[in-house]
Swiss-Prot record:
EC id: 6.1.1.23
Residues of the site described as Important for tRNA non-discrimination: 38, 90
Binding site for ATP: 228-230, 237, 489, 541-544
SUPFAM superfamilies: Class II aaRS and biotin synthetases, GAD domain-like, Nucleic acid-binding proteins
GO biological process: aspartyl-tRNA aminoacylation
Similarity-based family: Belongs to the class-II aminoacyl-tRNA synthetase family. Type 1 subfamily.
Function: Aspartyl-tRNA synthetase with relaxed tRNA specificity since it is able to aspartylate not only its cognate tRNA(Asp) but also tRNA(Asn). Reaction proceeds in two steps: L-aspartate is first activated by ATP to form Asp-AMP and then transferred to the acceptor end of tRNA(Asp/Asn).
Catalytic activity entry: tRNA(Asx) + L-aspartate + ATP = L-aspartyl-tRNA(Asx) + AMP + diphosphate
PROSITE patterns on file: AA_TRNA_LIGASE_II
InterPro entries: Aa-tRNA-synt_II, aa-tRNA-synth_II, aa-tRNA-synth_II/BPL/LPL, Asp-tRNA-ligase_1, Asp-tRNA-ligase_1_N, Asp/Asn-tRNA-synth_IIb, AspRS_core, GAD-like_sf
Region of interest called Aspartate, as start-end residue ranges on this chain: 206-209
Organism the protein comes from: Geobacter sp. (strain M21)
Protein's name in the database: Aspartate--tRNA(Asp/Asn) ligase
Location of this chain's protein in the cell: Cytoplasm
Length: 593
């Protein structure tokens, strides 16, 4: 028989009780995590979001409560009253926060039973993720996921407190906006009132936060949901959360200083990790030169070494021809990996090919010198020069790629991360931040045969590069900056264009006609003509940040109700079909599948 609360009030959470509570009368409420019948006495681990208390049903203390305990099973919901007591000698559990006490039950209410579970919640058995997502309400009862989400809440509170203390105003921007598909696809929402017209869910609040600066709010922030209809990965979701900020009358240094303080506050108070300020900085060009990528993981070495000048006149035509044809040759020294087998090197070669490399040359450093199929093509002087460049020692493994600069950097940059993971060089307890600055403003899109914005069309060029936007676009650097943590971009921002004529020029460079630019962004262009202050901002990906703080493998482990890699919610069965009446009201007719 199911009981009602009947006016009972919880006095403590299950994880709160300690030795200092011994002798107190308490009321606990929660779920049965485990039940053990010891021939008369029944022991139940009662769990809530705060932890577990062991409660004891003794028929001599309360026969009615003991009778109820005989019928309970895992995940039944109970409310109990009892007395906190010290555990008997020899039964103290130092692994539990409440391990020195137990609660002797005097009354019990069975608030709800539970069906047999589709999987256990103890974490000892691997469960298919789709099953976990289907029964997300059960999965969320597990300690790890609950603690992840509680910590996420703390980070959000710290963010609001810090930004408010620094003069930021929390403002909301619309979710139903105009579609301006320049990057990922928009999620579209049909308008019932204006048939044939659509809203778009925002990919970011970019334009609205800039307009708030035009409006004179000076400093804005928002912890906001954003939406992108794109193919998903372990660290991507169709809906995601940003810590979004914008500031007026500032330059890059002002933004970086304030946001470094935010990261230091979050990591100190939420993670117990001190962030050394100021955070290291590196230009985009330096990052590409040293690490092959613009989001380098600085927890380990494996830096890239360019060898083009050394090999351009060598007898190894593969390298020489690439360099003389406008390409480059780079390599890396994998310290202590000289014993790697040929199969392992072949596997690395196949990995590099994923990113465009045609092959991977290698050298094993032995007591006799180079052991490699390519050794015979180089003079002793060339070998000595490369050894010095690599700081090569006996037992090392040298890896080389020769190709166009983009292919070389992409393949070796990704290979560097792959090797670090394979060799255990990425300590999860180390957090290395770096600001990447001075990005290119524009990049040539070979497929579309036009220039594209590296960040977004509202990023301002460096003052000294503005003169080259039309004449030499590839030369222009952006007032953009990314914050990278352990090889993950966790935030990106820029100083914005605040002059209408410069913004119109940028749209022109991106291949937008004046009419098209006005159609998509006319409200921004109009606003820029009414006294817009210099302004800039940044957005941090809260989901990815929490994934790194908690050491999770996927952002799905730090989001309460995530989607699958097919964009589905298995629990609620979204997306789903809608009935014909709804479609008729919207003026929509579905094409045949």
């Amino acid at each position: 028989m199911i009981d009602f609360l009947g006016g009972w009030k919880r006095t403590s959470y299950c994880g709160e009780l300690r030795g200092g509570h011994i002798g107190q009368e308490v009321t606990l409420m929660g779920w049965v995590s485990k039940r053990r019948d010891h021939g008369g006495l029944i022991f139940v681990d009662l769990r809530d979001r705060d932890g577990i208390s062991q409660i004891v049903f003794d028929p001599e203390r309360c026969a009615e409560a003991h009778a109820k305990a005989e019928s309970v099973r895992n995940e039944y919901v109970l409310a109990i009253k009892g007395t906190v007591a010290a555990r008997p000698e020899g039964t103290v559990n130092p692994k539990m926060k409440t391990g020195e006490i137990e609660v002797l039950v005097t009354e019990c209410k069975l608030l709800n039973p539970s069906k047999a579970l589709p999987f256990t919640l103890d974490g000892f058995v691997d469960v298919n993720e789709n099953i976990r997502l289907k029964y997300r309400y059960l999965d969320l009862r597990t300690g790890t996921l609950q603690q992840n989400l509680i910590l996420r809440s703390k980070v959000a509170q710290l963010t609001r407190s810090y930004l408010s203390d620094n003069g930021f105003i929390e403002l909301e921007t619309p979710f139903l906006t105009k579609s301006t598909p320049e990057g990922a696809r928009d999620f579209l929402v049909p308008s019932r009132i204006n048939k044939g017209e659509f809203y778009a869910l925002p990919q970011s609040p970019q334009l609205f936060k800039q307009i708030l600066m035009v409006s004179g709010f000076d400093r804005y922030f928002q912890i906001v949901r954003c939406f992108r209809d794109e193919d998903l990965r372990a660290d991507r979701q169709p809906e995601f959360t940003q810590i979004d900020c914008e500031m007026s009358f500032i330059d890059r240094e002002d933004i970086i200083t304030v946001m470094e303080g935010l990261m230091a506050r979050i990591f100190t108070e939420a993670k117990g990790v001190k962030v050394e300020l100021p955070i290291e900085r590196m230009t985009y060009q330096e990052a590409i030169r040293r690490f092959g990528v613009d989001n380098p993981d600085l927890r380990f070495g494996l830096e890239l070494v360019e060898l083009s000048d050394i090999v351009k006149n060598s007898g190894f035509k593969v390298f020489a021809d690439v360099v003389n044809g406008g390409g480059i040759v780079k390599g890396m020294n994998v310290k202590g990996a000289g014993a790697m087998s040929r199969k392992e090197i072949d596997d690395l070669t196949e990995f590099a090919k994923i990113y465009g490399a045609k092959g991977l040359a290698y050298v094993k450093m032995t007591a006799e010198g180079w052991q490699s199929p390519i050794a015979k093509f180089f003079t002793p002087e060339e070998i000595a020069t490369m050894d010095k460049a690599f700081d090569a020692k006996e037992g090392d493994l040298l890896l080389f790629v020769a190709d166009k600069p983009k292919v070389v950097n992409d393949s070796l940059g990704k290979l560097r991360n792959h090797l670090a993971a394979k060799m255990g060089l990425t300590d999860p307890n180390v957090f290395r931040f770096v600001w990447i600055t001075d990005f290119p403003l524009l990049e040539w899109d070979e497929e579309a045969k036009r220039w594209a914005a590296v960040h977004h069309p509202f990023t301002a060029p460096m003052d000294e590069d503005l003169q080259y936007v039309e004449s030499d676009p590839g030369r222009c650097r952006a007032k953009a900056y990314d914050l990278v943590l352990n090889g993950n971009e966790i935030g990106g921002g820029s100083i914005r264009i605040h002059q209408e004529e410069v913004q119109s020029l940028m749209f022109k460079m991106l291949g937008l006609s004046e009419e098209n630019a006005r159609s998509k962004f006319g409200f921004l262009l109009d606003a820029l003509e009414y006294g817009t202050p210099p302004h800039g901002g940044i957005a941090f990906g809260l989901d990815r940040l929490m994934m790194l703080i908690t050491g999770s493998d996927s952002i799905r482990d730090v989001i309460a109700f995530p989607k699958t890699q097919k964009g589905a919610c298995l629990m609620s069965d979204a997306p789903s079909g809608v009935d014909a009446l709804q479609l008729r009201e919207l003026g929509i007719r579905l094409a045949a599948k």
